[in-house]
Amino acid sequence: MKQKLLYTLTATMLLSGQAVQAGSLENLERERALTVMEMIDGELSAAERWEKLSAAKRRLADLERIVLSDKKLQGKASQLVQRSFQSFELTFLAHASAEKQRSMQSHWMSEVGLSTDELLSTRVSR
Protein backbone atom coordinates (compact mmCIF):
# COMPACT_ATOMS: atom_id res chain seq x y z
CA MET A 1 0.00 0.00 0.00
CA LYS A 2 2.79 2.40 0.94
CA GLN A 3 4.69 1.54 -2.21
CA LYS A 4 1.63 2.25 -4.36
CA LEU A 5 1.16 5.61 -2.64
CA LEU A 6 4.84 6.41 -3.15
CA TYR A 7 4.60 5.63 -6.89
CA THR A 8 1.48 7.75 -7.20
CA LEU A 9 3.07 10.71 -5.41
CA THR A 10 6.26 10.41 -7.47
CA ALA A 11 4.33 10.28 -10.74
CA THR A 12 2.21 13.26 -9.71
CA MET A 13 5.26 15.32 -8.81
CA LEU A 14 7.01 14.48 -12.07
CA LEU A 15 4.00 15.23 -14.23
CA SER A 16 3.06 18.44 -12.44
CA GLY A 17 6.63 19.70 -12.71
CA GLN A 18 6.38 19.95 -16.47
CA ALA A 19 5.06 23.39 -17.20
CA VAL A 20 3.25 23.89 -20.45
CA GLN A 21 4.02 27.21 -22.04
CA ALA A 22 2.02 28.63 -24.87
CA GLY A 23 3.75 31.13 -27.07
CA SER A 24 2.54 34.64 -27.73
CA LEU A 25 0.90 33.66 -31.01
CA GLU A 26 -0.97 30.75 -29.43
CA ASN A 27 -2.25 33.07 -26.69
CA LEU A 28 -3.42 35.55 -29.33
CA GLU A 29 -5.19 32.82 -31.29
CA ARG A 30 -6.94 31.56 -28.16
CA GLU A 31 -8.11 35.06 -27.19
CA ARG A 32 -9.24 35.80 -30.74
CA ALA A 33 -11.27 32.59 -30.84
CA LEU A 34 -12.97 33.53 -27.57
CA THR A 35 -13.72 37.00 -28.96
CA VAL A 36 -15.28 35.58 -32.12
CA MET A 37 -17.39 33.24 -29.97
CA GLU A 38 -18.63 36.27 -28.02
CA MET A 39 -19.41 38.07 -31.28
CA ILE A 40 -21.71 35.33 -32.50
CA ASP A 41 -23.18 34.25 -29.15
CA GLY A 42 -26.95 34.47 -29.51
CA GLU A 43 -27.51 34.31 -25.75
CA LEU A 44 -25.90 37.72 -25.05
CA SER A 45 -27.89 40.93 -25.02
CA ALA A 46 -26.54 43.89 -26.99
CA ALA A 47 -25.31 45.59 -23.81
CA GLU A 48 -23.55 42.44 -22.57
CA ARG A 49 -21.97 41.87 -25.97
CA TRP A 50 -20.74 45.48 -26.15
CA GLU A 51 -19.23 45.22 -22.67
CA LYS A 52 -17.49 41.91 -23.36
CA LEU A 53 -16.18 43.00 -26.76
CA SER A 54 -14.86 46.29 -25.39
CA ALA A 55 -12.75 44.39 -22.87
CA ALA A 56 -11.77 41.83 -25.51
CA LYS A 57 -10.61 44.56 -27.88
CA ARG A 58 -8.19 45.90 -25.27
CA ARG A 59 -6.86 42.41 -24.52
CA LEU A 60 -6.49 41.61 -28.22
CA ALA A 61 -4.66 44.87 -28.92
CA ASP A 62 -2.20 44.11 -26.12
CA LEU A 63 -1.64 40.53 -27.30
CA GLU A 64 -1.24 41.70 -30.91
CA ARG A 65 1.47 44.14 -29.85
CA ILE A 66 3.22 41.34 -27.97
CA VAL A 67 3.11 39.06 -31.04
CA LEU A 68 4.33 41.79 -33.38
CA SER A 69 7.32 42.51 -31.14
CA ASP A 70 8.10 38.84 -30.36
CA LYS A 71 11.65 38.20 -31.56
CA LYS A 72 11.15 34.41 -31.36
CA LEU A 73 8.62 34.52 -34.21
CA GLN A 74 10.89 36.34 -36.66
CA GLY A 75 12.17 33.88 -39.21
CA LYS A 76 10.18 31.00 -37.72
CA ALA A 77 8.86 28.76 -40.49
CA SER A 78 6.03 26.97 -38.68
CA GLN A 79 2.70 26.78 -40.47
CA LEU A 80 0.93 28.65 -37.67
CA VAL A 81 3.29 31.61 -37.91
CA GLN A 82 3.16 31.74 -41.71
CA ARG A 83 -0.62 31.41 -41.88
CA SER A 84 -1.11 34.00 -39.13
CA PHE A 85 0.94 36.65 -40.88
CA GLN A 86 -0.56 35.83 -44.29
CA SER A 87 -4.06 36.43 -42.94
CA PHE A 88 -3.16 39.63 -41.08
CA GLU A 89 -6.70 41.03 -41.33
CA LEU A 90 -8.13 38.14 -39.32
CA THR A 91 -5.21 37.38 -37.01
CA PHE A 92 -4.61 40.94 -35.87
CA LEU A 93 -8.30 41.77 -35.57
CA ALA A 94 -8.08 44.78 -33.22
CA HIS A 95 -5.36 46.54 -35.22
CA ALA A 96 -6.84 45.75 -38.63
CA SER A 97 -10.30 46.97 -37.63
CA ALA A 98 -8.82 50.17 -36.18
CA GLU A 99 -6.86 50.79 -39.40
CA LYS A 100 -10.07 50.48 -41.42
CA GLN A 101 -12.04 52.51 -38.84
CA ARG A 102 -14.62 49.77 -38.37
CA SER A 103 -15.84 47.77 -35.42
CA MET A 104 -14.20 44.41 -34.86
CA GLN A 105 -17.50 42.67 -35.57
CA SER A 106 -18.11 44.29 -38.94
CA HIS A 107 -14.45 43.90 -39.93
CA TRP A 108 -14.44 40.19 -39.04
CA MET A 109 -17.74 39.56 -40.82
CA SER A 110 -16.60 41.29 -44.00
CA GLU A 111 -13.30 39.36 -43.96
CA VAL A 112 -15.06 35.99 -43.69
CA GLY A 113 -17.55 37.00 -46.38
CA LEU A 114 -20.70 37.84 -44.44
CA SER A 115 -22.73 40.94 -45.24
CA THR A 116 -25.56 42.63 -43.38
CA ASP A 117 -28.01 41.72 -46.14
CA GLU A 118 -27.04 38.05 -45.95
CA LEU A 119 -27.44 38.04 -42.18
CA LEU A 120 -30.82 39.75 -42.32
CA SER A 121 -32.08 37.28 -44.92
CA THR A 122 -31.35 34.28 -42.69
CA ARG A 123 -33.80 32.84 -40.25
CA VAL A 124 -33.09 31.49 -36.81
CA SER A 125 -33.88 27.85 -36.20
CA ARG A 126 -33.00 25.55 -33.35
Positions of PLM-derived features:
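Bacterial N-terminal signal peptides that target proteins for export
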Residues: M1-Y7
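Short helix-onset patch at the extreme N-terminus, typifying the N->h transition
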Residues: Y7-L9, L28-E29
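C-terminal amphipathic alpha-helix
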Residues: S24, E31-R32, M39, Q86-R126
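Long, amphipathic, charge-rich alpha-helical segments that form helical bundles/coiled-coils
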Residues: L53-M104
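Immediate post-signal-peptide N-terminus of mature secreted/exported proteins
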Residues: V20-R58, S121-R126
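Bacterial N-terminal signal peptides
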Residues: T8-S16
